[in-house]
């Protein structure tokens, strides 16, 4: 069963959002 394009887009968006959140959290803890 192939993955729908919408599911791929959602997965990429969640990964990007998680990455940005992790970077911001790391910078906040570093300061």
Swiss-Prot record:
Pfam families named in the record: PsaM
Keywords: Chloroplast, Membrane, Photosynthesis, Photosystem I, Plastid, Thylakoid, Transmembrane, Transmembrane helix
One GO biological process term: photosynthesis
Single GO cellular component term: photosystem I
Membrane topology type: Single-pass membrane protein
Transmembrane region(s): 8-28
Main location: plastid
Places the protein is found: Plastid, Chloroplast thylakoid membrane
UniProt similarity note: Belongs to the PsaM family.
NCBIfam families: PS_I_psaM
HAMAP family with a match to the protein in the record: PSI_PsaM
Identification of the protein by name: Photosystem I reaction center subunit XII
Species this protein is from: Chlorella vulgaris
Lineage, highest ranks first: Eukaryota, Viridiplantae, Chlorophyta, core chlorophytes, Trebouxiophyceae
């Amino acid at each position: 069963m192939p993955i729908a394009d919408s599911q791929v887009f959602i997965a990429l968006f969640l990964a990007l959002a998680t990455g940005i959140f992790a970077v911001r959290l790391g910078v906040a803890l570093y300061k």
